[in-house]
């Protein structure tokens, strides 16, 4: 049965342990969502959980960019889906550091961050956008992975050092005027094909991908469920700034994977542990019984299977 959930923002119990300032911040975010046309509290549980805009403050300067790169990212919420969700993933690309994030979600974050009246209704992004952002040190491969949990929950952060074993082929094609070469690999449960540009000798790509002697301009999983294609590439020198955000929880990668599995397999219990209350409804708008709500599961198709 296709189900939806109504989140009664006014009755959200803010988790104990947050400071008074953080509680006020969460309350303002949730209350403002109630004022948005179309009732943002009603959303499709067969899709990813909606990412809510957050306030981004400038932190330390990590380095200078040489390029800004935008990819169109299409992915299937479940392997059975015929339709794709779509986002734009932006890279701020330097020679030693790369920052990767959802450009559309950043637009909503920026609108909230720079709003003159932060108690006014916020701009909420449409569609299922990637809740991840990354900072990757290209000299060591160490990557900071950040993930915003649903409904103004804490931001999870963990460190990762991904390794890629690419097989570079002799196959070539031109993408946006750049000659690229095909490489393949198995990474965390999925097989990938990557087209990289040796003429841009920076070992990077969307999200935390890299490890090739050139920038990845196109990346697809061979099962057809995830596909990044180049949308724009421009030379641009700018500070690559680490964002400062509130409500950060440090975890390990195994702890993060466990959280995501629990979120999708046992969402009611997971929301409750975050101090959130949600009220699932069926297609007819009737609230589910407690037993039915506990049986509710969210389809899960992460890009990293392992």
Predicted regions and their residues:
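Bacterial Sec-dependent N-terminal signal peptides
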Residues: 1-57
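Extended soluble regions of mature proteins
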Residues: 49-306
């Amino acid at each position: 049965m296709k189900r939806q959930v109504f989140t009664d923002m006014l009755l959200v119990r803010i988790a104990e342990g947050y400071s008074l300032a953080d509680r006020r911040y969460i309350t303002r975010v949730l209350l403002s969502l109630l004022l948005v046309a179309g009732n943002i509290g009603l959303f499709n549980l067969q899709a990813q959980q909606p990412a809510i805009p957050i306030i981004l403050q400038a932190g330390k300067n990590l380095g200078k960019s040489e390029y800004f790169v935008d990819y169109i990212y299409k992915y299937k919420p479940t392997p059975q889906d015929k339709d794709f969700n779509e986002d734009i993933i932006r890279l701020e690309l330097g020679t030693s550091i790369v920052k990767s994030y959802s450009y559309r979600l950043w637009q909503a974050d920026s609108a909230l961050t720079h709003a003159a009246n932060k108690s006014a209704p916020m701009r909420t992004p449409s569609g299922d956008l990637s809740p991840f952002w990354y900072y990757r040190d290209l000299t060591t491969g160490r990557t900071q992975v950040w993930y915003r949990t649903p409904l103004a929950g804490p931001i999870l952060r963990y460190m990762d050092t991904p390794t890629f074993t690419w097989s570079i082929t002799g196959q070539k094609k031109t993408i946006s005027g750049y000659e690229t070469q095909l490489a393949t690999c198995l990474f965390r449960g999925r097989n990938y094909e990557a087209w990289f540009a040796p003429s841009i000798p920076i070992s990077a790509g969307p999200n935390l991908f890299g490890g090739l002697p050139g920038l990845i301009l196109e990346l697809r999983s061979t099962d057809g469920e995830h596909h990044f294609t180049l949308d724009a590439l421009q030379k641009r020198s700018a500070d690559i700034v680490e964002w400062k955000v509130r409500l950060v929880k440090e975890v390990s990668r195994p702890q993060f994977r466990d959280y995501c599995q629990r979120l999708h397999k046992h969402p009611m219990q997971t929301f409750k542990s975050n101090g959130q209350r949600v009220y699932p409804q069926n297609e007819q708008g009737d609230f589910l019984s407690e037993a039915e709500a506990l049986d509710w599961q969210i389809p899960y198709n992460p890009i990293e299977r392992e």
